[in-house]
């Protein structure tokens, strides 16, 4: 079945709070043998979502925070579309007039964009997700690490040993297994990023040490 609990989980990890979470799922690399299945499953989940006033009970996804950030997201989507990548804007709009007037963007899936495009290379911080196929684990790891950012990563597989092997090669401060984001956080572990995602840690023993002063 194309639409699975995994597709629902991936949706939540990227589109929670309209994608406006620092540790949200940024890019999705899928083995080519499962690519079509994941694309269709995730599309089915996204198409059920209702975008609109976040105070209404029928709404699944609210607006982007401000006009500037909305433009950042829509510019990324537009650049990807202009480059020839397929873009699928999913979901339903509860109030068309409000949607046009507000800072709304339906959940957008961008299929196999070039690695150099902003939707892949930069942080979108909004409701858009690039999905790229890969053929080998080495390729997936290389492409995942091909970024100036390195806050969070995740590995999704039923093979725990393979997941651990891959996770040790990812250049990120935190790696989740079959999960992603704040709802999967273990507060006993230090949290922070590599590269341009910052320095230092909070949470865990190491996080406490960051706030200590030393007197010799």
Where are these regions (language model features)?
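ALDH superfamily catalytic-core signature
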Residues: 5-114, 177
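Conserved C-terminal structural/oligomerization subdomain of aldehyde/semialdehyde dehydrogenase
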Residues: 50, 100, 104-216
């Amino acid at each position: 079945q194309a639409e699975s609990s995994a597709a629902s989980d991936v949706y939540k990890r990227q589109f929670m709070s309209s994608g406006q979470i620092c540790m949200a799922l940024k890019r999705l690399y899928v083995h080519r043998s499962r690519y079509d299945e994941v694309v269709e499953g995730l599309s089915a989940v996204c198409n059920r979502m209702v975008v609109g006033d976040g105070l209404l009970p029928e709404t699944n996804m609210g607006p982007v925070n401000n006009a500037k950030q909305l433009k950042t997201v829509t510019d990324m989507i537009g650049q990807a579309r202009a480059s020839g990548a397929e873009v699928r804007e999913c979901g339903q709009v509860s109030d068309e007039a409000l949607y046009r007037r507000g800072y709304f963007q339906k959940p957008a899936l961008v299929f196999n964009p070039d690695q150099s495009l902003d939707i892949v290379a930069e942080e979108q911080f909004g409701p858009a997700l690039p999905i790229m196929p890969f053929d080998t684990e080495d390729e997936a790891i290389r492409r995942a690490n091909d970024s100036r950012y390195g806050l969070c990563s995740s590995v999704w597989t039923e093979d725990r040993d393979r997941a651990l092997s891959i996770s040790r090669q990812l250049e990120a401060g935190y790696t989740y297994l079959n999960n992603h984001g704040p709802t999967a956080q273990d507060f006993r572990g230090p949290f922070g990023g590599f590269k341009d995602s910052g320095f230092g840690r909070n949470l865990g023993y190491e996080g406490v040490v960051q706030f200590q002063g030393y007197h010799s």
